[in-house]
Amino acid sequence: MLDGFTRHGLFDLSVRVHGDLQVDDHHTIEDTGIVLGTALKEAIGDKKGIKRYGSCILPMDESLVLCAIDLSGRPYFVWDAEFTTDRIGDMSTEMVKEFFYAISYACGMNLHIRVLAGGNNHHVAEAMFKSFAKALDAATSYDPRITDVLSTKGLSLIHI
């Protein structure tokens, strides 16, 4: 799933994880999300010049997933998805949600993931990772018209 994230988001990522998989996958996957979210926050930096918002609706065969991101610095996570099996390969399906929650809070992003159509659980999960990648790529893209942080906080409204 992380390979799909890096390829479709056009990100360079190398991950080496040592976990307690002999117990279960919870800590390993959650900690990977925390570390990735922290690394993203650090890589994004002061956010000057980036678009801040990104979204993607991505089809994967019968599945359709929406992902929307706001790199506001205020973590918030909305999940509207259900899996019909307990596992996808060696991964607990409940850990997909925990992974994205961990990234969201560690990075300080507002993250919404919603399954619009589903079927095959692997396709749904893969579409989640790829739509997240494309939304994050859009949100972190530079725009020469944005000369500072894209925000209206601290601005006074002038009524004419």
Q: What name fits each language-model region?
A:
Residues D3-F5, K48-C107:
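Intrinsic, low-complexity N-terminal interaction/targeting segments
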